[in-house]
Amino acid sequence: GGKEPPVAPVETPIVDKDGCRVKIINKIVSVYDANGKLLRQEDIIDYTRTNIKGEYASLSDFIHKWKASDKKKTIEQSFMAMGIDLKALKADQGMSDVDDFDFICYVAYGKKPLTRKERANNVKKKDFFSKYSAEAQAVLSILLDKYMNQGITEVEDIKVLSLADFAEFGKPAKIVKLFGGKALYEAAIKELEAHIYELEVS
């Protein structure tokens, strides 16, 4: 029996809010109507800007939504559903070290972006860590470094505590006890996030 031909990956069709089909090839976005007729083509950055502004009328709308969002990953996923891969776009623009938040504000509203490192350093200058035990402070410090290197969604997921970086503190269940339990650990993460984005006025 001959080998089966490789199965081509099934692409998830992207449909915009007007029900039009969207294809993205080489940074050019093509939008088709229900009959497959090409309606328009635009650059991926213009397409991204239009979609962000369609979703959030103003910069303060977006900041409010970002701060209110329980998990920043849901915002990232809403962009993916529109066919916008923030990570790839940032890499393409030479802005991989910039927070998704800053990148979105920059693309849509022309706001000067901060790098994740700048945001992390602003948190380090504050007295936020001092209310925690030395071990809990060390955990938060590693989480802040994770944010700086990889982004906020990495920090939000409690699975991060299973990584080798945290091995010296024990298993995740033991680590959350350093904060007084899971609820207080999650509250500490929320507070860390609030400090990361503190300079933003909504």
Can you describe what each PLM-predicted range is?
Residues 2-202:
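Catalytic cores and motor modules of nucleic-acid processing enzymes
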